[in-house]
Amino acid sequence: MEGLSGNCPASHCRDFISHPALGRHSGSLASHQGTVYPDITTQDAGRQFPAPQASSGTSLGYGYAFGSPYYGCRLSYSHNVNLQQKSYHPAEKYMETSGALPAEELSSRSKEFAIYPSFASSYQTVPGYLDVPVVPGISAHPESRHEALFPMDSYQHWALSNGWDEQLYCSKEQTHFNHLWKSQFSDVVPHQAEMNGYRRGRKKRVPYTKIQLKELEKEYAASKFITKDRRRRISATTSLSERQVTIWFQNRRVKEKKFVCKSSKSSTNMHSV
């Protein structure tokens, strides 16, 4: 490197800096065991890679500026891991990688996320599913390394605003099972009214016995309107509640009134004829 400091003759410096000098001084550059990048623009000639603070298992990137062309080299300090970059990476990219991840994790993830040429043809894509990339970037979160398939075209929205959708049942299937529905549920249809009655809280109607009806008719013949004392006495003798006795007397008066009206109409019709 004495030619850069100005201690060597001018003719020697011209040979060292000129572009064809790479062939004559290839022995001095081969000792560094680096990769030469000849296709670099002249705008990046002044850039140099900063040496990242890495352990013995990582590689160190640096560059030489010989006039206008730029030569980038990477030195590997480990014999087990050999990472060779086949394309030019600027200095900002090296700074991002070294700042985001430690050096040990960077060397291990470089093996884990290696993309092989036959990776795209190793599995067949299923139509109707969305493929999520299995291999994320180096700075991605480690928990996102999962292959997920989301169905896209099999989803249907069920509108349940007023009930079930009308297109849920097929008419062809119903024609085959109409006789089964009639035979199995024919006994249940007459009891629908009773089931509705139970739902409204009404009790099943229990007819009165002959002894109870005889006692009620006897009291009704004595008086069409019942008092509180008589109601208690009839309830005790007939084993009925006071409310049942009161309702029976009301129904009996309505029945008698209808009978009287009907008989009066029939009598008037007879006289008119």
From Swiss-Prot:
Q: In this entry, which stretches build a coiled coil?
A: none
Give the protein's biological function: Sequence-specific transcription factor which is part of a developmental regulatory system that provides cells with specific positional identities on the anterior-posterior axis. Plays a role in early embryonic development.
| Gene3D superfamilies hit by this protein | Homeodomain-like
One Pfam family named in its UniProt record: HoxA13_N
Per UniProt, subcellular location reads as: Nucleus
Keyword Zinc present in the record's keywords: the answer is no
Q: Name one GO biological process term.
A: regulation of transcription by RNA polymerase II
Q: InterPro entries under this entry? A: AP_axis_regulatory_Homeobox, HD, Homeobox_CS, Homeodomain-like_sf, HoxA13_N
What family does the database annotate? Belongs to the Abd-B homeobox family.
Result of knocking out the encoding gene: Morpholino knockdown of the protein results in a biphasic developmental delay characterized by a reduced body size with 22-23 somites by 24 hpf; the first delay occurs before gastrulation and the second during late tail bud development.
Q: Name one GO cellular component term.
A: nucleus
UniProt-recorded name of the protein: Homeobox protein Hox-C13b
MF terms from GO for this chain are: DNA-binding transcription factor activity, RNA polymerase II-specific; RNA polymerase II cis-regulatory region sequence-specific DNA binding
Keywords from the UniProt entry: Developmental protein, DNA-binding, Homeobox, Nucleus, Transcription, Transcription regulation
Location of the DNA-binding region in this protein? 201-260
